[in-house]
């Protein structure tokens, strides 16, 4: 297939000199087969793939997101079973090519995910959060449970799904599946380390571990505290899911890889095409390959420069990149 097929279970060095991989998030499956993205690792959700009749053959590296945030945000539960997801993964790997890694059917732990938010809006509205009250067995007319108890349930389901998928997937796909640590606050993240250990999983020996429930945090200092604490306990192989890119200067040194689709949101909010040749073609560049490639290229260029500066703490601050 190309780079992904030969990537093995190690962090490849195709993107930066020190081996940090920055995956470009995209909602366009056909980009996998686009030669323009051969050298750009892509991160794509199963929700964008699973209803297709045919799949594109990837020309470069890619990784699979389970789409868990959207699933639980919209429905308060998973709408597919682990068995169905395992079958989908096998299909993707066969037709697209072997992914660098596979995200499990984890359960995010942000308070909005747990308790719901803006439920008067349409389910498809970005501000709508269904809440997991029903999944947690809480009666609709009764008081909800404390955050710590709800997080514990989400974490228990996250660990259980990782164990289940590891058994359902054939090798080497089961080795590409990554465990994910979830939590609402730092003590929760530390607690799930023990939950994995109790299940016989030593996260420090895995080739990659996902860091979840960080994409909507407003305070990058809190994320930095969580990442640093996990790294101090031996997790030096983390992938940051949908990381808040303007905080990577605080915690990026502890991440082996990360993904972001911030380019698309940035272009959507811009409200008009970025490039002259796009005027009259589309109203903005939220779906534009050229905009995505330019953003990713700027990220990598700044990342490399930042790594060369001894005083630089981590990957880079992407505020300037997203404004470029």
Regions found by a protein language model. Name each.
Residues 56-57, 74-83, 97-104, 215-220, ...:
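Low-complexity, flexible helical/coil segments
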Residues 1-35, 67, 167, 198, ...:
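Alpha/beta catalytic cores of nucleotide-metabolism and tRNA/nucleoside-modifying enzymes
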Residues 1-164, 315-324:
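Non-catalytic, usually N-terminal nucleic-acid engagement modules in DNA/RNA processing proteins
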Residues 90-258:
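Eukaryote-skewed repeat-based solenoidal scaffolds used as protein-protein interaction platforms
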Residues 86, 90, 178, 190, ...:
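Generic detector of well-ordered alpha-helical segments enriched in charged/polar residues
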